[in-house]
Amino acid sequence: TFIVAGHETTALTLAWALYLCAFDPRVQERAAAEARGVLGGRVARPDDIPAMPYIARVVNETLRLYPPAAFLSRTALAADQLCGREVRRGDTIMLPIYALHRNHVLWDRPDSFDPDRFETTPDRYAFLPFGAGPRICIGAGFAMQEAIIVLSTLLARFRFEAIPGRAPEPRLILTLRPHGGVWLNVTPRLRVAE
């Protein structure tokens, strides 16, 4: 099912998003204010998503900086040329999504966490967290919904702070994982009357 197939990638996206928010309190507070304004103390639902565009941008920016599928591979269906190199039918082409998402030609300040860069739609080949074309991740829409719902609910209810000396190191083991986990201090926010 979609839920089982996408649980790891969504969990990784949420871990990286909380890590990034913990290191940028301005982003975290803006996202939390948006979530609290929409949710009013309850858990987010799918119909809340359109009212939380900033949190959607936080998720997209997280996927840009830490795409769970950091590499894509495709098999050439026909002979061609790619960047001046011959490609034979049957060759495997590896596309480094992590590098693409941090390319200075495609992105302004590519190593910076800036959710507002998604106020406009990026070039369709510059942002590929779910792949592209006929092999795009079939669960992309569900994954985005799930990430926005969980992240908004968490940020509305809790404050996340970085623990000095515990920054995770990205490691690629099928998916891009935070080696050693994501360690954060979590404190409850004051509850909004439900």
Where are these regions (language model features)?
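Conserved cytochrome P450 K-helix E-x-x-R motif and the immediately C-terminal K′/meander segment
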Residues: 42-83, 104
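Conserved cytochrome P450 K-helix/beta-meander segment immediately N-terminal to the heme-binding cysteine loop
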Residues: 95-121
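Residue-level recognition of short, solvent-exposed, well-ordered loop/turn junctions
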Residues: 88-89
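Cytochrome P450 catalytic-core helices
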Residues: 9-34, 140-158
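Conserved cytochrome P450 catalytic core segment spanning the I/J/K helices
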Residues: 1-13, 47, 52, 75
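Cytochrome P450 proximal C-terminal region
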Residues: 36-41, 136, 141-194
